[in-house]
């Protein structure tokens, strides 16, 4: 089902002081030129998986003369985000017609064999990374103005003429990021797979750290509040770019809309502008983002500046309770995220997120000695916990249920555990019961798996959390991930919430958090 929001009578309330602070923190991006490494041949195998059948030094490609319908594939050796340049010339007689060719860029190998003409998803096909280019005069240096996120490139010659052929003399990419991989010291966790998971996590985060924390450099190329929360946590244990996190918080806080609500995401070009999308859980997470930042930096001035915005999101959410003192169920409308799970009911999970974020609000209020807010928040927290158990706990199932159909899902249980509705001992029993029962509505995104790992650790199941991390993110690596993906279902690698995996993001911010867990909770394993 398409998930988007259009808010009628949408009004943006800008705080120019906040936006000026954010602009002053805009990073100067780091540039590094990399060159194509190999020419490869790709095809589908018997299992219909894309495989490399041959690979040659890139000089092999540069020695070729290409004519109509010739297709070549290039491997840059690792994921890259940046601007591609092709150095072209010709062989044969004088160029008597434009050379016309097609380019496609892919974050994973499968994109090289995707038939883009067959795309039938509900997101814009404009997200597919392809170009049709005419070059009137050769030799030429063709610099693509659009930033691409990729490892692999296809070039197909649509036409030259009978008198000349196209020659490629060089392919390079001017990569960009706010941070440098070399600035983070590698850690040996005593397990090669964990070391690789940590590396790929950091690579994923680095590629998404641009002018802001982007959700994905291929798609959506903008800033989502739920992603920011996880990216910032990983950043504090790796690149430690505190200014970028501060910048992003001030952007969100400087672009409130109706009733003081925070937008779920912000567009960064041509100027900062909030999307007319409100997600209850994402807005509430601002309290978590703010406290995480304060604990990492001790920046009390920023906490004072942004405190009211964080607490207001809790006040707004409290107006969305029903007569039973739990969050009103808005059904299939795009009102709360939690996960992309098909059919996932979000009422109980949203209530749990509210309880969870009130705990962060209380901690913020205590730092600033806001006694009235502390009393109000503690009262509402107790009320919500009592209501959540009364409305959602099913004694017979031994799990929380959600919505009119009393649905039991992984997401609901995990968020109730993180909300600490029960004590730790009961939560530990619950998480093991969920693993044994394995509710039909499963987790499908690394975003939800992050919260699963978090819940395990909070239940003192650190070793189990480590094994689950290795199982999920490790399997992604075995499936070819250079950077971690937006969505990963080991049982259906082509699953997509958008109707086609062609527009899935294969370098996605919310999947970068294994490095956060490893470096925060497992550094004692360092050799």
Describe the residue ranges of each PLM region.
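Extracellular/oxidizing-compartment recognition motifs
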Residues: 1-215, 243, 248, 264-268, ...
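Active-site core of glycosidic bond-cleaving carbohydrate-active enzymes
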Residues: 224-239, 243-527
């Amino acid at each position: 089902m398409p998930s988007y929001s259009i808010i009628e009578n949408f009004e943006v309330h800008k705080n120019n002081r906040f936006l000026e602070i954010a602009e002053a923190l805009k990073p100067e991006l780091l540039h590094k030129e990399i060159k194509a490494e190999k020419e490869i041949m790709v095809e589908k195998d018997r299992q219909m998986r894309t495989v490399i059948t041959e690979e040659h030094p890139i000089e092999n490609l540069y020695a070729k003369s290409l004519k109509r319908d010739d297709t070549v594939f290039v491997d840059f050796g690792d994921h890259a985000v940046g601007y591609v340049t092709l150095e072209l010339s010709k062989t044969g007689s004088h160029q008597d017609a434009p050379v016309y060719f097609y380019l496609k860029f892919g974050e994973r190998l499968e994109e090289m064999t995707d038939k883009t003409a067959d795309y039938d998803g509900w997101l814009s096909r404009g997200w597919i990374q392809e170009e049709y280019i005419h070059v009137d005069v050769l030799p030429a240096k063709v610099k693509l103005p659009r930033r691409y996120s990729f490892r692999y490139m296809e070039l197909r010659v649509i036409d030259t003429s009978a008198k000349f052929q196209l020659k490629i003399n060089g392919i390079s990419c001017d990569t960009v990021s706010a941070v440098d991989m070399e600035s983070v010291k590698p850690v040996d966790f005593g397990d090669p797979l964990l070391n690789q998971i940590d590396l790929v996590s950091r690579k994923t985060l680095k590629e998404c750290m641009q002018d802001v924390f982007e959700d994905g450099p291929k798609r959506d190329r903008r800033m989502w509040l739920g992603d920011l929360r996880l990216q910032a946590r990983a950043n504090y244990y790796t690149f430690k770019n505190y200014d970028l996190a501060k910048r992003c918080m001030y952007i969100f806080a400087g672009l409130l809309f109706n009733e003081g609500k925070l937008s779920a995401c912000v567009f960064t070009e041509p100027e900062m502008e909030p999307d007319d999308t409100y997600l209850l859980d994402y807005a509430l997470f601002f309290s978590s983002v703010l406290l995480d930042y304060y604990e990492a930096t001790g920046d009390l001035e920023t906490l004072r500046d942004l405190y009211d915005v964080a607490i207001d999101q809790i006040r707004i959410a409290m107006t969305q309770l029903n007569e039973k003192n739990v969050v009103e169920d808005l059904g299939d409308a795009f009102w709360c995220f939690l996960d992309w799970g098909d059919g996932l009911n979000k009422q109980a999970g949203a209530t749990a997120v509210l309880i969870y974020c009130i705990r962060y609000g209380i901690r913020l209020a205590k730092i600033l000695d806001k006694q009235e807010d502390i009393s109000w928040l503690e009262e509402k927290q107790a009320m919500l916990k009592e209501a959540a158990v009364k409305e959602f706990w099913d004694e017979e199932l031994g799990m929380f249920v959600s919505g009119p159909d009393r649905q039991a899902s992984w997401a609901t249980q995990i968020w109730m555990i993180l909300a600490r509705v029960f004590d730790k001992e009961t939560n530990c029993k619950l998480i093991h019961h969920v693993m044994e029962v394995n509710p039909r509505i499963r987790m499908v995104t690394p975003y939800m798996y992050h919260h699963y790992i978090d819940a395990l650790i909070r239940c003192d199941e650190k070793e189990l959390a480590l094994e689950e991390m290795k199982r999920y993110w490790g399997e992604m690596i075995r499936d070819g991930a250079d950077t971690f993906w937006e969505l990963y279902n080991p049982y259906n690698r082509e699953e997509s919430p958008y109707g086609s995996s062609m527009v899935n993001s294969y370098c996605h911010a919310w999947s970068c958090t294994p490095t956060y867990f490893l470096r925060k909770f497992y550094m004692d394993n360092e050799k």
